[in-house]
């Protein structure tokens, strides 16, 4: 998604503002959609990294912020005492600001956008493979955003295929505009495969994992710098810079992280011998030699 007609236009300020206009609305409805679908079985995350990783920014860290929570001028969109409805309205107003900055034509009389700048559109598609129904964590999120955008004259078409191959074929052909999918992460938070420009889909020798087509020299250098050290504090600081760059491009809205669940019989297993404080990277199977049966 970009404003302009060349491939290089994907990185312009106007193109970033276009994407942030959508991202701001997707971000504000995440808690509502997640609570409806997962409840306590998943938590909303604010950065494009596993929240269980040692490199994940934490609320107590300097510079930590809620995803897409500032307006086009860099001011906070929300206050702590806002109700949900006030937050939704504030996000919509911030979204309007981003679209205006992207070059969209705003009609004060109707309070809607009436025309898109060259290279952008009044209607965009998001692929959310919910098997033709609503059984997908992001389906309700997309619907909330669709309804919000409709108020300001922009159309979001939810492509809800029954065949999930539709999304993968679109990604392979580079025909997608927005899409919803889950991803898994390895123990080491190295970002080379997903975010380095050498792995943009179609590039020679590419892993094909950079579906955002994000080409940023500073990001590339930071990713490589982080690979030169085993110092976790150093790498965490570098990855925070990377995550902020990714957010500034407006190419991904982090949504949720599922909770791991295990069911055991206390009649059969001595639960005191089960691994305490399991994580996605270290669970009961890693300490199975310590487990005892009753």
Enumerate the language-model features and the residues they cover.
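A generic secondary-structure signal for well-formed alpha-helical elements
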Residues: 25-39, 102-103, 152-156, 183, ...
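Periplasmic binding protein-like
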Residues: 126, 147-202
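Short, solvent-exposed loop/beta-turn-alpha elements that line the ligand-binding surface or hinge
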Residues: 1-12, 52-90, 108-121, 169-174, ...
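Active-site-proximal beta-strand/loop segments in catalytic clefts of secreted hydrolases
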Residues: 25, 35, 50, 129, ...
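Append "and occasionally in soluble cytosolic enzymes with long acidic Gly/Pro-rich linkers
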Residues: 11-147, 241, 289-292
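Short amphipathic alpha-helical coiled-coil/interface segments
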Residues: 223-227, 232-247
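Flexible loop/turn segments at secondary-structure boundaries
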Residues: 30-32, 40-41, 132-137, 165-168, ...
């Amino acid at each position: 998604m970009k404003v302009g007609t060349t491939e290089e236009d994907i990185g312009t300020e106007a193109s970033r503002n276009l994407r942030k206009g959508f991202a701001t609305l997707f971000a504000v409805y995440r808690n509502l959609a997640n609570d409806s679908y997962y409840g306590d079985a998943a938590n909303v995350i604010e950065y494009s990294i596993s929240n269980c990783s040692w490199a994940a920014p934490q609320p107590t860290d300097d510079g930590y912020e809620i995803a897409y929570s500032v307006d086009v001028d860099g001011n906070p969109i929300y206050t702590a005492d806002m109700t949900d409805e006030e937050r939704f309205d504030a996000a919509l107003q911030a979204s309007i600001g981003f679209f205006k900055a992207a070059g969209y034509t705003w009609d004060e009389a109707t309070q809607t956008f009436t025309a898109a700048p060259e290279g952008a559109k009044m209607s965009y598609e998001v692929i959310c493979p919910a098997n033709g129904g609503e059984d997908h964590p992001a389906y309700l999120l997309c619907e909330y955003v669709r309804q919000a955008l409709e108020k300001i004259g922009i159309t979001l078409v939810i492509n809800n295929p029954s065949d999930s191959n539709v999304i993968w074929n679109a990604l392979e052909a580079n025909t997608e505009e927005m899409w919803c999918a889950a991803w898994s992460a390895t123990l080491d938070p190295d970002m080379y495969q997903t975010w380095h420009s050498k792995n943009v889909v179609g590039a020679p020798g590419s892993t094909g994992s950079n579906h955002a087509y994000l080409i940023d020299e500073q990001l590339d250098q930071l990713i490589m710098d982080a690979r030169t050290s085993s110092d976790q504090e150093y790498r965490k600081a570098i990855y925070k810079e990377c995550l902020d760059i990714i957010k500034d491009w407006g190419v991904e809205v982090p949504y949720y992280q599922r909770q791991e669940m295990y069911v055991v019989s206390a009649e059969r297993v001595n639960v005191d011998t089960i691994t305490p404080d399991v994580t996605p990277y270290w669970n009961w199977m890693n300490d199975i030699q310590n487990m005892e049966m009753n």
